[in-house]
Structures are given as structure tokens and as C-alpha cells.
Amino acid sequence: MDDDLMLALRLQEEWNLQEAERDHAQESLSLVDASWELVDPTPDLQALFVQFNDQFFWGQLEAVEVKWSVRMTLCAGICSYEGKGGMCSIRLSEPLLKLRPRKDLVETLLHEMIHAYLFVTNNDKDREGHGPEFCKHMHRINSLTGANITVYHTFHDEVDEYRRHWWRCNGPCQHRPPYYGYVKRATNREPSAHDYWWAEHQKTCGGTYIKIKEPENYSKKGKGKAKLGKEPVLAAENKDKPNRGEAQLVIPFSGKGYVLGETSNLPSPGKLITSHAINKTQDLLNQNHSANAVRPNSKIKVKFEQNGSSKNSHLVSPAVSNSHQNVLSNYFPRVSFANQKAFRGVNGSPRISVTVGNIPKNSVSSSSQRRVSSSKISLRNSSKVTESASVMPSQDVSGSEDTFPNKRPRLEDKTVFDNFFIKKEQIKSSGNDPKYSTTTAQNSSSSSSQSKMVNCPVCQNEVLESQINEHLDWCLEGDSIKVKSEESL
């Protein structure tokens, strides 16, 4: 029985030891435990902040911002208060803490979070004062986590390492302790009136600070960056500014300008109608007038138009004679089109609008307007005209007037066909013979078709152009009859 008791006691002791080890393993590690250096040597700053806020500050720091600072080298951390709504920012020095142990990062973060908590809860707004409230929270967190949060950090070696720009005063203060005239800074900022101690230094010493130390190749790097930064800017500026010695290429304006509301009737420089061509036309018409005497008071008013400007000339109306049939044969009537854009030329030639008698150029009845196209009439041969023209006729002298106001010409009007479009109309005057004028119109309209001969594509016989359609029908019907008769045989 003694053996059984001894065995039971031994088993109980082993069980207790296992339970103790299990309980010790289940206990959470301290925030500054050495094992964290291997488990998580570079923790996430935001994750640590959220964890500590819920664990030690009851979630009161949700409106606080935490971030790294790359330029801050004088202190390990700082808490900045922003506004009255509980907004503040915590910044930790990346240059000082990136090579320090994880323990220093945790303690510095908790230190600044205590300052933020005191500001948010309106207990203490002086971030430099580590008074009773600050010490109370500091000891509370130290007892819970095993950390060693202090009032000031001890990273003096790292701070001195980043102070690579040195200045020394050449006045009496270079012999006074504790600084002996030295000013050491991490940035290249020379001592000046912006420093709070500058006024006192000027009173007690009055010396000037001379730079005695800076990082290696610092001045060369600065000059290189300045050169690289200036060259592209100068190149871009010189690109836009022309050189004074170089001659600038002057490109004249090749477009066409318009003045709104301009009613000038002066001819434009680009007019193609010349007085020489008008004189030749007058000579041609005067010859026909001398051969066939017509009422001398009957005149034709010709208006030469181009780009909205006009030029008027009065010509004696020619009479129709047998010798003039060659000229009239070049005219053949066309049906007028509603779309006036179709009457445009390619070379920008002008148009001539003609009104008969003493009727104004715009007093033309809309019901009596029609268009007649003409072929090229050579002035050298006295049978062709080189200028494009459009004749504006009127059959009813006492009819209603159709005004055509001056409009700004479109760009498409520059391109006009080589052929000229002519409108003409014979007006009855008091001294003219109506029978004679009727025969003249009939002869002029039928002369073109009666004088021209064309070959029939079926029988190859010469036929008048006016009868070609009837002849083709007759030839095709005859061929079809022959084919049917051959098939029936």
C-alpha cells in the first residue's frame, strides 16, 4: 500500500508541473519581450497604434493620425495638436528609429499616445509638460506591459550622427562652455535671425558663424543638381524665344477676310473681269448691231459679279442676223435648278448678270427667271467669250420685283465651272416688231441643234443632234424587227 501511495504522489507532481508549464505558455508575451525582435522586428506602425488604442486608451484616439517623418532627426517623436475638434497628429522619426530595437519604437509610440490622450480628454494640453497626469498614465502602462516609458529618450548618438553641418563663431563665444561657439545641424541652415537665441548672441558676442564641416561631396552634389535643373529650363525658354540675329520667316495671311455689314460696291482686287474683255464684247455686239438696225434706245445692262461686289456697264443690244447664227448656236437652253450651289466654278471665275432695258438689276420677277448655260466663247475668234456670265432676264416689265440683297459669298463660290451660265430674255419695247422678236427667239433656240451633226452609234450615219433620239429609236426598232423575222424563219 505504501508503494501505491508513492506512485500516486509522483504522478500528481508530474501533472502539476505540466499544468504550470501549460499556463506559463498561454500567458501573453510582454510588449518589450526580447522574442519580439525575432518574431516581428519591423512591425506595422498603424497596426501597433490601433492595438494600443483599444488596449490602453479605451478607443479614445480614433481621430488621431500617426505617420513616419523622414526629415525629423532632432527628436524621436512629436505630437502636434490641430484644431479644437480633438484632431492631432503623431509623427515618429524614421531616421532615428529605423535602426533601433523594436522596444524603442514601442516605448516612443506609447509616449506620444499619452500626450494625444491627454489632449483629446482635455486633461492636459501642454505637450511639453510631463506632469502628474502624464506620469500616472506612464506608470500604469509600464506596470501592465513591462515597458520602460520615460519622459525623454536617450538616442543622443543617433542625433549627433545626423548633425553633419557644423558652424563655429569667430567671436568670444568660441571659448565659452558648453558649446564653445559650435552650432551643429542636420540640415544646411546657417544660423541667422530666425533662431530664438540670435539677438542675445549679437549682444554678448557679435561674432559671425563660419561653416567648418559638411558631408562629403555635398557641395558638388548641390551644384550638379542645380545644373541639371537649370539646363532644361533654359532650353525650354530659348525654344520659345527667337534669336535676335536670326531673320524671322514672315508668312502673309493667305485667307479671305470679310467685314460684317459691308455694303461697298468697289471691285475686289481678285476680279477677273477687265475692261479689255468688255471692250471686245462691245465690238462684237456693235458689229451685229450695224448689220441689223434695231431700236438704238434698247440697251442691256450687264452686271459683273464676284464675291459680292458688282460692276455695271451698258451695252447696246445686238440684233439677230444670219451672220450672227454662229454665235447664237453656242447658246442652248437649260432647265433652271433650285439649288444655286450647282452653279459654281473651279477657278473662281466671275459671273455676269444681265438685265434688259432701264429695269433695275434686282427688279426681276421670280416667276420669269430661268438659267441658260453657255459654252466657252473665244474672243479671238469673235465667237466665244472667256468670261463666265449669268444673264438675269425678265419677261414682265411691270411685274413684281424680286430683290437679291448682297450676301457674303461662300467659300465654294471660288470654284466655278469653266462654262458660263447665262440668263437672257427678250423684252417687248414700244418700237420693236413682235413678229421679228418671236422669230429671233425661235432661231436662237434651235440654231444649236440644227447646225451640229453627230454619228449614229447603230447605223453610223450622220444625223442632226436634235434628231438623234428619234433616229436611235427608229434604228433599234428596225434591228429588233429583223431579229424577230430571222428567228421566225
Swiss-Prot record:
Q: What is its main location?
A: nucleus
Q: Which cofactor does it need?
A: Zn(2+)
Mark the residues carrying the PTM N-acetylmethionine. Answer: M1
EC number(s) for this protein?
3.4.24.-
Q: Where is the signal peptide?
A: none
Q: How is it modified after translation?
A: Autocatalytically cleaved in response to double-stranded DNA-binding: autocatalytic cleavage takes place in trans and leads to inactivation.
Keywords for this protein: Acetylation, Autocatalytic cleavage, Chromosome, Disease variant, DNA damage, DNA repair, Hydrolase, Isopeptide bond, Metal-binding, Metalloprotease, Nucleus, Phosphoprotein, Protease, Ubl conjugation, Zinc, Zinc-finger
Chain sites annotated for binding Zn(2+) 1: H111, H115, H130
Supply the InterPro entries for this chain: Rad18_UBZ4 (IPR006642), Spartan (IPR044245), SprT-like_domain (IPR006640), SPRTN_ZBD (IPR055220)
Record comment: activity regulation? DNA-binding activates the protease activity: single-stranded DNA-binding specifically activates ability to cleave covalent DNA-protein cross-links (DPCs). In contrast, double-stranded DNA-binding specifically activates autocatalytic cleavage, and subsequent inactivation.
- Tell me the outcome of changing L260A: Abolishes binding to VCP/p97
Q: Where is this region: Disordered?
A: 357-409, 428-453
Where is composition skewed (Low complexity) in this entry? 363-383, 437-451
Q: Where does the sequence pass through the membrane? A: none
Which residue ranges does the UniProt annotation give for the motif PIP-box? 325-332
List the disulfide bonds in this chain. none
* Biased composition range(s): Polar residues: 384-403
| Phenotype when changing S383A | Abolished phosphorylation by CHEK1
Role, per record: DNA-dependent metalloendopeptidase that mediates the proteolytic cleavage of covalent DNA-protein cross-links (DPCs) during DNA synthesis, thereby playing a key role in maintaining genomic integrity. DPCs are highly toxic DNA lesions that interfere with essential chromatin transactions, such as replication and transcription, and which are induced by reactive agents, such as UV light or formaldehyde. Associates with the DNA replication machinery and specifically removes DPCs during DNA synthesis.
Q: Domain remarks in the entry?
A: The PIP-box mediates the interaction with PCNA, while the UBZ4-type zinc finger mediates binding to 'Lys-48'- and 'Lys-63'-linked polyubiquitin.
Oligomeric state and interaction partners are given as: Homodimer. Interacts (VIA PIP-box) with PCNA (when ubiquitinated). Interacts (via its SHP-box) with VCP/p97. Interacts with RAD18. Interacts with KCTD13 and POLD3.
Q: What is this protein called?
A: DNA-dependent metalloprotease SPRTN
Q: Identify the coding gene.
A: SPRTN
